[in-house]
């Protein structure tokens, strides 16, 4: 099964830039979207179905035009779960899961820490998400968590680790959390197969030349639970897709 994760930074904006044509060409079995910034009634749902995705699930934020996640799939899931059931985690539409016979796929949009208030919210979300996943793994050991984690794990994952050492997204406490999350039973599928530097998934629009000069951050991941480790066939970053300030990431599970 080929799975793609993509923070589209506004699905309507991405559609206007050719997203649906790209989706047909990329042809994943499942695509996890983050930061959709829209509700399903605002979207051309028939176009997604005509593109080959009859099953599409949308979890927008309560606040209009903000956050939100979605999953589109060619294969009908046996179960769909919107959110975690924890109010402070769910009102911004940050977590959606589909269950298939063999494993489950989750679309995750971890909060960013743009100011002290949001950083506190981010750390609370991270702690509660870890606890949620610890319990979920007892029920669903085969789990793929795709999304925008808003964290660079290692120095190799960011273009300027020294200058960004005190910036949210690369703070020691954030990196420690991701390190512990991985050690608790997950594989960073891209790093499992690729140890090369210069592979990023997000480039700030505040610096217009950042993407052209590849001054980026790798904050989008497809994390695969340990029982699926030997079934990771491919893991790629797809920087040629330019519908967003992020690019898609891909994992293929046998």
Task: Please give the residue ranges for each predicted region.
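Metal-dependent phosphoesterases centered on the DNase I-like endonuclease/exonuclease/phosphatase
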Residues: 51-55, 127-215, 219
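Surface-exposed cleft-lining segments at the edges of enzyme active sites
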Residues: 85-86, 110-126, 162-166
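Conserved beta strand-loop-helix elements of the APE1-like EEP
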Residues: 64-80, 208-230
């Amino acid at each position: 099964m080929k799975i793609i994760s993509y923070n589209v930074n506004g699905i309507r904006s991405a559609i206007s830039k050719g997203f649906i044509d790209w989706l047909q060409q990329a042809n994943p079995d499942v695509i996890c979207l983050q930061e959709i910034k829209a509700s399903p009634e605002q979207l051309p749902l028939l176009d997604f179905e005509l593109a080959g995705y009859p099953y599409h699930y949308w979890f927008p934020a309560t606040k209009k035009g903000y956050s939100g996640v979605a999953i589109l799939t060619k294969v009908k899931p046996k179960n769909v779960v919107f959110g975690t059931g924890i109010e402070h985690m769910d009102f911004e539409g940050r977590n959606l899961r589909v269950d298939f016979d063999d494993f489950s796929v989750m679309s995750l949009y971890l909060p960013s820490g743009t100011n002290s208030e949001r950083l506190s919210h981010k750390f609370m979300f991270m702690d509660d998400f870890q606890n949620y996943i610890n319990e979920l793994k007892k029920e669903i050991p085969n789990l793929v968590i795709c999304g925008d984690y808003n964290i660079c794990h290692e120095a190799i994952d960011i273009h300027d680790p020294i200058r960004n050492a005190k910036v949210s997204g690369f703070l020691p406490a954030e990196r420690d959390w991701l390190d512990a999350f991985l050690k608790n039973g997950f594989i960073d599928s891209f790093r499992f197969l690729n140890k090369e530097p210069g592979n990023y998934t997000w480039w700030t629009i505040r610096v217009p030349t950042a993407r052209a000069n590849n001054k980026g951050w790798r904050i989008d991941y497809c994390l695969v639970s340990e029982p699926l480790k030997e079934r990771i066939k491919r893991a790629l970053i797809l920087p040629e897709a330019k519908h967003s300030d992020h690019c898609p990431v891909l994992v293929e599970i046998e």
